[in-house]
Amino acid sequence: MTHAPIGIFDSGVGGLTVARAIMDQLPGEALRYVGDTANAPYGPRPLADIRARTLAITDSLVAEGVKMLVIACNSASAACLRDARERYDVPVVEVVLPAVRRAVATTRNGRVGVIGTQATITSRAYDDAFTAAPGVTLSTAACPRFADFVERGITSGRQVLGLAQAYLDPLQQADVDTLVLGCTHYPLLTGVLQLAMGDHVTLVSSAEETAKDVLRVLTEHDLLAEADGEPAHEFRATGSGESFAKLARRFLGPSLAADAIDPLAVSSSSA
């Protein structure tokens, strides 16, 4: 079981930021990644639809024999994290709490902002997570178009900057000094987001902290792979493999082979 892959799921390409962090911190672990690009972005979808899509794909990953699941999508974590942990015998790691812990440790004035998809913000997953952090004042803002821009490979330019300034203005007015990127797509917008918020604001991505959680949980369950060679990774998408591969190279580097990306058909029905 220790040599079984880690299963990673995201609505599209954003979870590749988490995959990259895991590859960097745990180079001996094999990854099996599925991006539901045919149905991205998840943000505008009802939580029930997100739950059904997520569990359909995570069911398939567990059936393939992964030793751990990483739900590398904030919207999916908000929709069905509890369901997934009750449903599967393998450990399930998510991306919300790691980002919250980092933000609490980072803020200097106690004012933290969170941006995410409409589904993530509506779910109040971050509001609930921050309740255990006394002294933190939380401000949130939905950024419904960001994930779609990233999925289309548009991560800079005047249009994206203007959108960011409009979305983030309430958080600037709230004087936040720490901004949680509550969607794994958003690290590709770091340049635009930093410009819109100013250098005095620290941006927090969950990717690095999630990778630390993966290491901790694998260690606790005695599931760490032995470093005995180059692990085999698989990256798949429910939509166009070619489009996915092009965007994936921005996260994982130009050496990612296009033939490593296979189309995946997954039923959206789930119990």
Swiss-Prot record:
<comment type="similarity">
    <text>Belongs to the aspartate/glutamate racemases family.</text>
</comment>
<feature type="active site" description="Proton donor/acceptor">
    <location>
        <position position="183"/>
    </location>
</feature>
<keyword id="KW-0961">Cell wall biogenesis/degradation</keyword>
<dbReference type="GO" id="GO:0009252">
    <property type="term" value="P:peptidoglycan biosynthetic process"/>
</dbReference>
<dbReference type="InterPro" id="IPR018187">
    <property type="entry name" value="Asp/Glu_racemase_AS_1"/>
</dbReference>
<comment type="pathway">
    <text>Cell wall biogenesis; peptidoglycan biosynthesis.</text>
</comment>
<dbReference type="Pfam" id="PF01177">
    <property type="entry name" value="Asp_Glu_race"/>
</dbReference>
<feature type="active site" description="Proton donor/acceptor">
    <location>
        <position position="73"/>
    </location>
</feature>
<dbReference type="InterPro" id="IPR033134">
    <property type="entry name" value="Asp/Glu_racemase_AS_2"/>
</dbReference>
<dbReference type="GO" id="GO:0008360">
    <property type="term" value="P:regulation of cell shape"/>
</dbReference>
<dbReference type="InterPro" id="IPR015942">
    <property type="entry name" value="Asp/Glu/hydantoin_racemase"/>
</dbReference>
<feature type="binding site">
    <location>
        <begin position="184"/>
        <end position="185"/>
    </location>
    <ligand>
        <name>substrate</name>
    </ligand>
</feature>
<keyword id="KW-0413">Isomerase</keyword>
<comment type="function">
    <text>Provides the (R)-glutamate required for cell wall biosynthesis.</text>
</comment>
<dbReference type="InterPro" id="IPR001920">
    <property type="entry name" value="Asp/Glu_race"/>
</dbReference>
<keyword id="KW-0133">Cell shape</keyword>
<dbReference type="GO" id="GO:0071555">
    <property type="term" value="P:cell wall organization"/>
</dbReference>
<feature type="binding site">
    <location>
        <begin position="42"/>
        <end position="43"/>
    </location>
    <ligand>
        <name>substrate</name>
    </ligand>
</feature>
<dbReference type="GO" id="GO:0008881">
    <property type="term" value="F:glutamate racemase activity"/>
</dbReference>
<dbReference type="InterPro" id="IPR004391">
    <property type="entry name" value="Glu_race"/>
</dbReference>
<feature type="binding site">
    <location>
        <begin position="74"/>
        <end position="75"/>
    </location>
    <ligand>
        <name>substrate</name>
    </ligand>
</feature>
<feature type="binding site">
    <location>
        <begin position="10"/>
        <end position="11"/>
    </location>
    <ligand>
        <name>substrate</name>
    </ligand>
</feature>
<keyword id="KW-0573">Peptidoglycan synthesis</keyword>
<protein>
    <recommendedName>
        <fullName>Glutamate racemase</fullName>
        <ecNumber>5.1.1.3</ecNumber>
    </recommendedName>
</protein>
